Amino acid sequence: MKLTLAAAVAVTTFIGRAVADIDPIVIKGSKFFYSSNNTQFYIRGVAYQQDYTANSTTTTTSSSSTTSTSYIDPLSSKTTCERDVPILQKLNTNTIRVYAIDPTANHDDCMTLLANAGIYVIADLSDPTESINRDDPRWEIALYNRYTSVIDAMAGYKNTLGFFAGNEVSNTVDTTDASAFVKAAVRDMKSYISSKNYRSGLGVGYATNDDKEIRVAMADYFNCGEEADGIDFWGYNIYSWCGDSSYKDSGYQDRTEEFRNYSVPVFFAEYGCNEVTPRKFTEVEALYGDVMSEVWSGGIVYMYFQEDNDYGLVSVIDSTSVSLLADYTYYSSRINAVSPSGTNKASYTPTNTALQSCPPVTSASWLATASPLPPTPNSALCSCMEQTNACVVDSSVSSSDYADLFSVVCGLTDCTGVSANGTTGSYGAYGMCQPKQQLDWALNKYYSEQGVASACDFSGSATTTSTVEATGSCSSMISQVGTDGTGSVTGTATGSATSTTGTSGAGRVVAGGALGGVLRALL
């Protein structure tokens, strides 16, 4: 069935009128509610983003500059949103999940269309090139800036429900150490939302995969320790109900019992097994039925667009029309037939308020310590350190060669201070800095220890440079960190540095990317 923009005019006529005063969603205990009344909110969601492997797009920003991304921002095109919002409405959709947006793009048109249709948005904070890497985890300045920029772009819309700070980052026991870095991101994004005085109902959560070896420990870890560090909601990517399965055989019964006493809302962040086609979505009745709806706050079906993975509800014909697939028809009949009764907010007193016990670190089952977490990225500290380095990497050295140079210098000086270890909870003060800043620190540390000009050469890969004497807050931060970089900074940095010449005091770094792998091999 082909549905064009023109054919949807009757459905979307109201969209061009005044913007709907959509009611923001709030969290109370383990449930979502509309903020202005006592009605519980159940997510009837659809994952809404074309494949990351699609051709790059160029987005024009409000300043008339252009930016190129390796993904298609699903909220930046008024034309496509005008095409798709009516179709989402027919599915009784009240939430979409978007996996990557361009924070420099203008999202007003799409967010208005969605708001007028009563549709909320959960946005992932990462993008295909900027996310926490399970094989080489780090929480550093570039990621912090990416994540906060997405929050800045979306926080002003009343129909922004919240954000995911990660998606299936840890997916085996061997990669669970990465969860420490994701939890640090959750902590810092929650703190950022508060510091910016954004709407208090905006939540930060995580979307996990359904791995039997780690699923319980994952849920416990992100909901243990300090409440300020934990997730506001928990998304579960689950594909265990295939074809005409059942509440018991699919594992839904076990998962429901596991989360019965969880203290924050839980929902399916992705669901819709396609091992049996067409997908008849018989799980919808169970998910929104009386038993599961006591625990789960609905779910997000995967996905709107048909791609090579064959999960689509529609196939795109062009910018104004799509073809409805068989899955669309089956899902529509199921989702439009459910109506969970829900809980009255006024009479609801949460009883499951206790946080989970943190999973112990063992080589066989869990590798992330709950405390301490990686430090909050501090660009001021990194800048102060950078300006006080007398020996730095030469400008002729390609960034692709940083790892090799790092392995050499760390074979000559103690680089323990630059490691980041989610299992032991050992994090360097400069661990959030950029790779060049980290390499500069290591080179300068060795140079300062040797005290001779030849110590800053490395076959032409390093060079001496004029330095800046740290003053004020910069001096205080550098002092707190120490020359070996094992200290920590207290308070907020606002200092600067003044120009002088001479040798520097050193800072401390944690290497990300290729450098991180080198460090783990050396330390």
Each language-model region and where it sits:
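Substrate-binding cleft of secreted/luminal carbohydrate-active enzymes
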Residues: 280-350, 438-443
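Short, acidic/polar
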Residues: 61-62, 67-88, 142-152, 213-227, ...
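Aromatic-lined substrate-binding rim segments of carbohydrate-active enzymes
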Residues: 80-132, 182-205
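Active-site-adjacent substrate/metal-binding segments within catalytic domains
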Residues: 21-117, 151
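Active-site groove signature of glycoside hydrolases
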Residues: 147-177, 205
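Secreted/extracellular ectodomain signature
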Residues: 372-499
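Noncatalytic carbohydrate-binding groove/subsite architecture in carbohydrate-active enzymes
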Residues: 177-294, 321-327, 348-367, 371
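Cleavable C-terminal sorting propeptides in eukaryotic secreted/cell-surface proteins
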Residues: 499-523
